[in-house]
Amino acid sequence: MRQALEVADIFRCHGPAWRATRAGHVSLAQLKAMSAIETCRTAALGGHLEGCEDCGHRRIAYNSCRNRHCPKCQGAAAREWLAAREADLLPVGYFHVVFTLPAEVADIAFHNKAVVYDLLFKAASETMLTIAADPRHLGARIGITAVLHTWGSAMTHHPHIHMIVPGGGISLDGERWVSSRPAFLLPVRLLGALFRRLFLTRLLELHTAGRLQFFGDQSGLNDQRAFARHLAPIRKKKWVVFAKPPFSGPEAVLAYLSRYTHRVAISNRRLISFDEAGVTFRYKDYRCSGADRHRTMTLHADEFIRRFLVHVLPQGFHRIRHYGLLASAGRKANVARARELLAVPMTDETAAPDAPSDPRPPCPCCGGRMVVIETLKPTFRARAPPRLRPPAGMVAS
């Protein structure tokens, strides 16, 4: 069912003027996301005409854009992803671990998203794998599913990694399953200290290699010594790693993952109103507790669009990654070995999948089955290719 107010409504109303005033300062990925969201489930993308087999009622269903930043398209994507991951789940407790960048480092990431977000993944995963392998702690190889979120509840820039980690791993010799303590995976203070060291060491290496760029008020950080001075106080700060107690079972893990894997900066459900005053939406202020945490905010439409687009990821950037036992190269063999050590039956990944349920909602008049009776062509036209200028000295025909 369509929400009363959608991000698409705001984009369609204010998007053209917003793009015009910022021509040359909006990335191609951001422009593509805006266009996809504006045309999603409209005649522009085409669709089909459905008819009820019983009463003859007809309705039009338009196609989805399937853009990963579209608030309307994430439900189906999440269901498909979770179905593929179900075979990897083990009958053990799972922990939720969060790695967050300090505000000073988030500012660096703002203009270097692909490079710094990639470093965030690498430093956080290496931290977990290194300390888990230490015999003084777990002494095992663990599996990690990591998801990048770049936003706070008010759509501010707040990069952090959510990890789902089984409570244990395969011993370093591969001969037994090593379980973690029931409510304790790894020491978070040690995780925070190693994460800080790995991240800052490699961030400095990236700067030395010329892979970081700074503009405007931060342009002074292009200088090597100025950048090193900027990092000095950050090295002394405590970097917080948060770990939640384990889930009650694999089903709870899937339910929890579904809330994190395919989120976007703001869902349509959080939008309250859109008028000349701006866009009003619900958010959570995590500095408060209880009922005081739930608040509303009103932003000018231009600022709302700017904040939303801050979280459009660079083209081709993978926001869900797997490490350790769940890394793609050895995932199947590692999961099979873990199941063997845990003495649980293997899942048959080659078995024929269950017949998919009909994705079309039933007839709103009689509850009958709706079938496609006509395909509707898209009305959206791509921009014409640029006209080529003839070489100097030639006259265009």
What are these regions (language model features)?
Residues 1-397:
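Beta->alpha loop/short-helix hinge microenvironment recognizer with preference
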